[in-house]
């Protein structure tokens, strides 16, 4: 039997890779530091560039996929997005004509089916041996792999161990995300009529960007997320904390509420969501807009020396606002599985060359996009 490929990280990239390999009869084992509890209960935009090739390995049609993962499937919806919503194509990398809003937790649950996932495994060490790379985890578990895939996100332990000089860059933007639950009858009466049939709506107030998104609908309630973001203002901006710890993300400064109050009257549904008294009861997180990148020579070096390759945010993170990181990770996984399945001696090296070009294009596109998102409306003339 073929030795299973160890995949570190069971997020979208790792899970998609596992399913794509399974589709080809290639075994894998996913090691994830988190637990099996449902997580990431928020909405993402899926572009057809990513989900169309995913349908084949899942043996689903697009309508069935939407019925499984769309944010509003419980109420008969298909994750629709208004044409008024600007979707970033990143200079043609993504086809946005038939994009829809999916609940990430639902998508991950779907992708987990049939996979061998080892939960609560935090990577401790990677050692090169005659049998390949040996992975050691904090719980004393270990495994060997002739190829190891780092798919463990922007805070990648694999990257920290093998490429410690590469750290995420923090872009000069302030961003906060909040979650709220609204009674279904209230949402249907007071929110939905002003959202133009879309599961995500956006507005500008000078250089500030405001977004409201449906995460999921149930019979009794609707889960909603909001985003408030803007460029950093000077060196003493109280809302910009680029050096905060991960644990400090839920420490929300009072200045946020003061700034939102100062925006004045907003149109519905923004007036209901960005009500500072209601916001104080929301689960709010401070977001950092991160990017990562590695040179092609560094990646080839790790592939040749340690038989390790990277996908997704572990090696080319894009900012949450203006980025297409979820779609990029899915495409990484699908194309890497193709390269592995061909069993060519230079297959993964060639895959790196192809994808690195797309990663550079995506990073540049996401940075242009986040800049344009925060331009005052009168000066915003180019499309995202």
Where are these regions (language model features)?
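Conserved Rossmann-like nucleotide-cofactor binding loop
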Residues: 13, 17, 36, 155, ...
